[in-house]
Amino acid sequence: MKHITNKAELDQLLSTNKKVVVDFYANWCGPCKILGPIFEEVAQDKKDWTFVKVDVDQANEISSEYEIRSIPTVIFFQDGKMADKRIGFIPKNELKELLK
């Protein structure tokens, strides 16, 4: 699982991958700790998507650009543009459904 730390890195990823899902999290966040393993498990099943994580405490510039106010927040990008944004914990079956 790739961890993105700066805007240039995320921009590059979005320009070279058609489908990207980004998990914005923090190490101290309880719901983030529950979502983390689910996110990684679903990433193993959904090979047509690129899964990455952004630690909001390490990547303020990215968090500000995408207006991350609560965590976890998961953003789905298609063709370099935001297609969906979910705030809060996402159950595994719902996350899989969002990636269809």
Curated annotation (Swiss-Prot):
The keyword Transport applies. Residues 1-100 form the Thioredoxin domain. The keyword DNA repair does not apply. GO terms for molecular function: protein-disulfide reductase activity. Disulfide bonds join C29-C32. InterPro entries: Thioredoxin, Thioredoxin-like_sf, Thioredoxin_CS, Thioredoxin_domain. It holds the Pfam family Thioredoxin. PROSITE patterns: THIOREDOXIN_1, THIOREDOXIN_2. Belongs to the thioredoxin family. Participates in various redox reactions through the reversible oxidation of its active center dithiol to a disulfide and catalyzes dithiol-disulfide exchange reactions. This is Thioredoxin. It comes from Mycoplasmoides gallisepticum (strain R(low / passage 15 / clone 2)).
